Amino acid sequence: MAGNDWLNSYLEAILDVGPGLDDAKSSLLLRERGRFSPTRYFVEEVIGFDETDLYRSWVRASSSRSPQERNTRLENMCWRIWNLARQKKQLESEAVQRVNKRRLERERGRREATADMSEDLSEGERGDPVSDVSTHGGGDSVKSRLPRISSADAMETWVNSQKGKKLYIVLISIHGLIRGENMELGRDSDTGGQVKYVVELARALGSMPGVYRVDLLTRQVSSPDVDWSYGEPTEMLAPRNTDEFGDDMGESSGAYIIRIPFGPRNKYIPKEELWPYIPEFVDGAMGHIIQMSKALGEQIGSGHAVWPVAIHGHYADAGDSAALLSGALNVPMIFTGHSLGRDKLEQLLKQGRLSTDEINSTYKIMRRIEAEELALDGTEIVITSTRQEIEEQWRLYNGFDPVLERKIRARIRRNVSCYGRYMPRMSVIPPGMEFHHIAPLDGDIETEPEGILDHPAPQDPPIWSEIMRFFSNPRKPVILALARPDPKKNITTLVKAFGECRPLRELANLTLIMGNRDGIDEMSSTSSSVLLSVLKLIDKYDLYGQVAYPKHHKQSDVPDIYRLAAKTKGVFINPAFIEPFGLTLIEAAAYGLPMVATKNGGPVDIHRVLDNGLLIDPHDEKSIADALLKLVSNKQLWAKCRQNGLKNIHLFSWPEHCKTYLSKIATCKPRHPQWQRSEDGGESSESEESPGDSLRDIQDLSLNLKFSLDGERSGDSGNDNSLDPDGNATDRTTKLENAVLSWSKGISKDTRRGGATEKSGQNSNASKFPPLRSRNRLFVIAVDCDTTSGLLEMIKLIFEAAGEERAEGSVGFILSTSLTISEIQSFLISGGLSPNDFDAYICNSGSDLYYPSLNSEDRLFVGDLYFHSHIEYRWGGEGLRKTLIRWASSITDKKSENNEQIVSPAEQLSTDYCYAFNVRKAGMAPPLKELRKLMRIQALRCHPIYCQNGTRLNVIPVLASRSQALRYLYVRWGFELSKMVVFVGECGDTDYEGLVGGLHKSVILKGVGSRAISQLHNNRNYPLSDVMPLDSPNIVQATEGSSSADIQALLEKVGYHKG
């Protein structure tokens, strides 16, 4: 291409580069349109790039003096614009394809689930799935979405009804800097509105009647870069109003921030880097909850542990943690997403600036999404701030389908079987707000003496003068925006709208409170980029003296900032592209500020209730400017919006929020560990050796106990909590009682024989059942070897490394594997090992737990009486099994002559809580993420695991795993995780990541299980490095071919000392 001078004039024509026309010379069309520019619309909306960025590129391209070089630069720029526009179209096409694919998958899964659930209904009962659902779910009114506070009498009645209850509630929010006073909101992207929300929620719940204690668990940060207060283990949250509900205070009652140490000890890191340390947090949090439950039991539980009535996770990382804690402790879980990963991914892809890989690398977005999916699997209730979050964001997830959710809910109301399908309930509960510190304005600008804001009085808040110093005319109304400098907050569009509208500039000032900063160079790249863009726009539109952007403010200054804007008859604006809720809008309304807010997200619901402002399209500068101008120029409208806000603000209060919150918790089916523990950590049952308390407890839990060695299922289980259709409950109970009586007699006959505990000089604890309770340390062998001979070699190596401690009995061993108990028996016999060489056997990938029998003549192993009741939450039973078999039959080798089936059921290997499948061609089996997606779309909750180098698939309960089984041993028997050493290979089964990380020590044996890296882990949603804390001091790696002496040296390195 030659002679590109025309490009310069073309770009000059479509860019606003020259001096603006004054109103007298501008065309009537432009004046009527409010300076609407068709060319700018083309640049920013059609091409999809900011005019300022394009102008900057054009200036650089045309700055060369050489005509030939300038032509070349302009040509390259045009090709770049063309390529970017083409890329944008490609991204839009890919987005449409993703939506269509998701819709087809959802519809297919919905059809299959509905067909399965319709098997037991007559033709007249089935009806149309959607119409059947609508009669039970939809049509929520505004009142049902945003419950209004009751009258004083109704509230008093409710308070009286809660007296006598003493609930323990656990909240989790692990990222950011959290403290009760002087919160550093806006310091970074992790310390924002969520921090304030969880602190105020904990404080408000702690003041409610019927709530004895609230713990807000977060990360302990002892970094020199942050204040010392973030390193304090415990901080009490004093109630705002001690007169509220303080009549039943006790020794440990109230609300507390509990800081759990995990991750790098002396470093404050962003939330994207916390993922590998989640297991360590879970272990630490579990220790605190168990300790606190025991302490509360002594105070208010008559000696019985008081377990949390719910564990509430906030954001994806805490949702992942809450799900693991809920499974380990067997208590209900609640989840609040705050900001959702799938929605963020869609927004970033639409921008077209980053590829999926780049997004995942920067934000760890796939790990975040999987955590949110796991939270949906484990939670009873999802609490949202708005209906929009449910309808437009949560429906993007495989684990939630609004139509299927209403269908399942309708069947539950009719007491009809759901065939193992579960869906969390979505509840809209707007965040509350504290009103104690809000005082009405003590004056109005119209009644103040002249110049009151030009020369602030000494008693005026210091932040006022800090803002006013920016303005040449401080008496004008203040347009206030309070948000951190984040692209999604859309501050630059607000500044453009202000700069483009001359009437607005003449009538008002703009105040931007964009967090705290010392220097622009010290800010994160994203934040500094936004701030620089704002400063350049201020310079471009010559807004000096009209825009304030103070560098610092304290949290205590925020009320004064609102008061200043209200005193000047200003407006509060939230122009974010999408606002999950918009708590600042409620705060502003409480101070008498009308609002202008985005029409995307929570502000729609807030505006519907408060009716105190206008909604705008955040992408439309003219819409923003017009709304602001309308409010600041029309005093009657301003006064009406102000009055509406003040009149209706009481609809958003913490007491009402907590009342609704507690009523939702009350609907959760109570779950907690079923056994009772004595003070010394033992069982409080009649027999010290018995792991169970009584047959009555077993019968109440409807446990399907299994004491056989063949590993076969003893009957169908866990259909969906419905009654036995064959009416065989009596026969089943009789079989259970006979089995337990026989087992108990076997225990009483003899003490443990063989192994290290044969010695008569053993301490008195040796007779305890199971033997692991008497150990000082536990070695957990969870090595997923390629062959059984390799596993035997590793076991003997670890036995040898234990040395004298094994002979003395101070160290016990646990075998953790995907094998069934019958396969383990065969393996032990062939390897010349005794069942008593191990204190426990975690079988079937963590779905079964056995101990060596004290009477080995009668039977070699006995199952834990309570383990299945602990892990059976949302187990799909027969409904899940049928769906899995149908899925397996569809996986065939299309290249073979007879469409050979790749995945087939392994009935002889399956148990009540583990459905096993043989995989003939591991390389051709679908990746696990596809199976998880399929099950979630059909509302089936499970944990599929490829094991034994991909030749077997085990499907177990959703919150069960080998790592969770170790946590169960801690909860059940009190054996501390920090005293466990877990041996794993270089890689292993697809649950491998859960075994590395946590409070236990981990020894990675290089060269063992390495084949699984390519066989099983290539098709992961996220790399292992995103979830494995290889820099943890609790993890050491043994070189290939290490000897027992090498392993002993590694154990000393991680702090393991003999004795």
Curated annotation (Swiss-Prot):
Reaction(s) the record says it catalyses: beta-D-fructose 6-phosphate + UDP-alpha-D-glucose = sucrose 6(F)-phosphate + UDP + H(+)
Keyword Glycosyltransferase found: yes
GO molecular function, one term: sucrose-phosphate synthase activity
Stated regulation of activity: Activity is regulated by phosphorylation and moderated by concentration of metabolites and light.
Top EC class for this record: transferase
Keyword check for Glycosyltransferase: yes
Any one Gene Ontology BP term: sucrose biosynthetic process
EC annotation from Swiss-Prot or TrEMBL: 2.4.1.14
Region (Disordered): 95-145, 671-695, 710-731, 748-769
Domain of life: Eukaryota
Compositional bias segments (type: Acidic residues): 681-691
InterPro entries: Glyco_trans_1 (IPR001296), HAD_sf (IPR023214), SPP-like_dom (IPR006380), SPS (IPR044161), SPS_C (IPR035659), SPS_pln (IPR012819), Sucrose_synth_GT-B1 (IPR000368)
Recorded metabolic or biological pathway in which this protein acts: Glycan biosynthesis; sucrose biosynthesis; sucrose from D-fructose 6-phosphate and UDP-alpha-D-glucose: step 1/2
Sorted UniProt keywords: Glycosyltransferase, Transferase
Biased composition (Basic and acidic residues): 102-114
Known role: Plays a role in photosynthetic sucrose synthesis by catalyzing the rate-limiting step of sucrose biosynthesis from UDP-glucose and fructose- 6-phosphate. Involved in the regulation of carbon partitioning in the leaves of plants. May regulate the synthesis of sucrose and therefore play a major role as a limiting factor in the export of photoassimilates out of the leaf. Plays a role for sucrose availability that is essential for plant growth and fiber elongation.
Subunit structure: Homodimer or homotetramer.
Similarity remark: Belongs to the glycosyltransferase 1 family.
Name this protein carries in UniProt: Probable sucrose-phosphate synthase
